[in-house]
Amino acid sequence: MEELLAELLKLRAALLALRPGARLFAFWDLDGTLLRGDCSEGLHEGGRELYPGLVHLAIEDGHSPDYSGDDSGPLRCRNDYRELGERVGAWLAYPFLAQIFSGASEHDLQALAARHFDTTLRKFYFSASRTIFDGLAAVGVEQHILSASAEFFVRGAAASLALPAHRLHGIRVRTVEGKLTRELLYPVTYAEGKVTQLIEIIRAAEAETEQPVFVLAAFGNSFDTDKAFLAHVVRQSLPVGRPLAVMINAGFAPTNYRGLFRSVRQKKVVGDR
């Protein structure tokens, strides 16, 4: 991954030499890409829980009218979530994990997530991913998270990533007077929805400046949820060089995507140091 960082820094330098005022971006998935495991679902390996997911913690804390109130709530939720994914698909299952907290305080759930990231999840960021993430941040590349987890959970990672909260994007539901509802807001940051969110971010940046805006890189870990936005980035035409799209621990690419992405394997996390 250090070689990829060096390549990106070289691309950054070439773009700024050609367009000195350019605004440069990189986009990341969160779960399985920056974070080992899943902030919503937790991390379990070898029959052992390495950390609990935020859905479990929030249900235990009493934030879900559907599942809080008895000890079986987290298990019932997990079973319903898996059944949705198997019978209907991830496009419905991922939003479900945001909608089950209808009536809860968005502020309270984001605070719960921030505590979990700051005390536990920050130790499970992949070391190599953080090397690239921190290296790009150090030279002023504007980085955004595009996650299929609920946005009120994802934004809990802001302090641990040293990012403004508005740069962390997840699945959103409408809020009324600070309380969550079941009504989804679009785009839903799953698959093609991540492309739509990325385009909205770049168009907003272009509207703020007369200088050019370039996307250097995109990082993901799933050909289901991430291939669309990675492909969108790597197929850009830059005035010099070529953007990178990196798949982490993703396995074999579908036929139409072979040779398009860099493939990286990693397991070590910052807490292993």
Q: PLM features: what roles do these ranges have?
A:
Residues 40, 45-135:
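A metal-dependent, Asp-based hydrolase signature
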Residues 2-25, 107-273:
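C-terminal cap/substrate-recognition subdomain and adjoining C-terminal extension
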Residues 1-30, 35-42, 50, 56-57:
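Non-catalytic pre-domain segments flanking phosphatase-related domains
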Residues 32, 62, 178-179:
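Detector for glycine-centered tight turns/loop "hinges" at secondary-structure junctions
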